[in-house]
Amino acid sequence: PLTLFRIPALILIGFYRNTPAIVHFFWSYYALPIVSPLTLSPFAAAVLALSAQSAAFYAEVYRGGIQSIGAGQWEGAKALGMSRVTALRRVIFPQALRRMIPPFLERSFELLKSTALASSLAYSELLYQAMQINSQTYRPLEVYSLIAVMYFTLLLIISQGSQLLERRLAVSDTR
């Protein structure tokens, strides 16, 4: 029964991982209304595009984390009489989670940076606002430098927090 879902999932994951996010933005906003009765606002199209692409990348993080756990862990859980689901929940996933955090956080940073692409749909996110201000003030150096500093500051704070989390989990892993 899982094979029914595996092939479509692999195709979707491959598609979203191997095409640029801007294509997903444009397709969600301009092409989706042509092939379906849905007409999305720029915000909804941006959310749909980012969600679909991020789901594909996060799925790979989960897959990689679970596959990184040795077969001996599965065998040990089976020897203890655990079902596959119980083994995954109690043995495999807690170990895999520690390994998944760095790529999960990295993808989250990429997701945050990708929100700037929403400006291509005329959605008023940070970069779009900067373009509007620049068109009124004709001060691109100041405007775009400020935006760069804002993104850098936000991501630096998140990055520092993620490093603390990684250190905390690494310490708890060695106990």
PLM region spans:
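Transmembrane alpha-helices and adjacent helix-loop boundaries
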Residues: P1-R175
